[in-house]
Amino acid sequence: MSEQNSTEMAFQIQRIYTKDISFEAPNAPQVFQQEWQPEVKLDLDTASSQLADEVYEVVLRVTVTATLGEETAFLCEVQQAGIFSVAGIEGTQLAHCLGAYCPNILFPYARECITSLVSRGTFPQLNLAPVNFDALFMNYLQQQAEGEGAAPHQDA
């Protein structure tokens, strides 16, 4: 019999949850009187922390700001989090898992939450396009190599 490698790769979602929600419409109801031609800004940020041996929390923060001219129509922020068991990977592979793979899992939940909040604010439907977290992570690695130590972040 051959000896099996004791460090098998394993990934499991333990829990996905909303950690924080904020919705503000600071210029309502006046903003509803204006023609709806907003400028929409999307801001993404990820963070991860180790909770236990091979157990990590990943938090995806999504902030959407819609402005009409100089006025803020709405500001919506969601922190979507997950607890993940990750075993058998280290270094760059682990960083990629926590910085790209897990946020890819969390984003649809955050997007649904934001869409619901905007709708409840009686604003027109907001459709957020999918995000390529793999490309964002590669940009982050490139920035790290160039000496810029910022966390994975995107303005769209």
Swiss-Prot record:
Its main location: cytoplasm. GO terms for molecular function: unfolded protein binding. Pfam families: SecB (PF02556). Keywords: Chaperone, Cytoplasm, Protein transport, Translocation, Transport. It is found in: Cytoplasm. GO terms for cellular component: cytoplasm. Homotetramer, a dimer of dimers. One homotetramer interacts with 1 SecA dimer. Belongs to the SecB family. This is Protein-export protein SecB. It comes from Serratia marcescens. The gene is secB.
